[in-house]
Amino acid sequence: MSGYQRRPGATPLSRARSLAIPDAPAFYERRSCLPQLNCERPHGRDLDSPFFGIRPAFMCYVPSPVLASVGDTDFGYGKGKCSKQSPSGAHGTHFGDDRFEDLEEANPFSFREFLKTKNLGLSKEDPASRIYAKEASRHSLGLDHNSPPSQTGGYGLEYQQPFFEDPTGAGDLLDEEEDEDTGWSGAYLPSAIEQTHPERVPAGTSPCSTYLSFFSTPSELAGPESLPSWALSDTDSRVSPASPAGSPSADFAVHGESLGDRHLRTLQISYDALKDENSKLRRKLNEVQSFSEAQTEMVRTLERKLEAKMIKEESDYHDLESVVQQVEQNLELMTKRAVKAENHVVKLKQEISLLQAQVSNFQRENEALRCGQGASLTVVKQNADVALQNLRVVMNSAQASIKQLVSGAETLNLVAEILKSIDRISEVKDEEEDS
């Protein structure tokens, strides 16, 4: 991916946390070779000053979703803590217990103090003790002494970079701070500085580059290398082609001015590119986060639907199981009823066979009765004639007896009347005797 080279095996968060921001004295020593992310000039200071009293204000935006995914929302680089957000939208980070106001007023390496001690240092010290070789600059960049000399980059850094001696012993303080912050020894370098030391960058593509290329196009992540050449080499024209050999202070001023302007331009360009990349990555991250939240909500909805469906299927399964059990019970009952019906049918068949035998017997009896009916009729007629004759004899005898009874009844009536009159006859006789 064109733009800034990534170290292999380092995520964007670990790269942001591996930024090595030096303290103020070491910062002024190594500012000629170590790039800063943001440089703020104090008010009322000359813009073309080679040492314009840079006040380090670390501006590196790390999105909160990335910190939340890692579980770390507190920056702690070395001894410092992240302060509240500045009006420009960046986080102004204070490192250690130093204050920017104190550094601006009582900094022995400010431009004001430098002008006071410049003439004395140039007159008393040897030029060899003032300007170190490339080994010192390489050591200030954190490179090994065994690494090959730096190659020419795209920013015109092919000359030897000066390293000014620290009269107050700030280098020892820097070494002590580097020993204390061994966990943050790695330094973030833009592609221009990293290309000057290609041995430190492996040939393979890091996982971070594939991660960023997934969300951004190569044109969006283009670094300072894709900028026009006039923006990078504009400050070269400000360097005077020739300087008086007998005025080392003028040579040093011109050299420092060109160096400071070049670094200011390159750092401003790299800062703008990083800011654009940061905003694009922030937008991409917001989109990815919203998409992830939508997908998570969709997954939760699908899980709820799946759970409801599973509960419904389980209830349906229990209902179906109960129905199957009921059907099995009904089948058992029907089987028992079928067995009973078969037994009843067998009994009915036996009864039918008995009834058929009885019917056959009755038919034979009817036939026998029909055959013997003619002989019985003649006998019956004869018996009826005899009975009629006997009845006639009885009737005749009955009439004669009836007549005798009627005559006897008349005699009986006469006797009854005579008996009634006997009482009267006796009473009359009694009356006659009394008289």
UniProtKB/Swiss-Prot annotation:
- Tell me what PTMs the record reports for this protein: Phosphorylated.
Which segments carry the region annotation Disordered?
Answer: 136-185, 225-251
| Compositionally biased residues, Acidic residues | 173-182
What domain of life does the UniProt record list for this protein's source?
A: Eukaryota
Cell division in keyword set: yes
GO cellular component, as recorded: centrosome; ciliary basal body; early endosome; endosome; midbody; recycling endosome
**Stated consequence of mutating E194A:** Disrupts interaction with PTPN13
Q: What is this protein called?
A: Endosome-associated-trafficking regulator 1
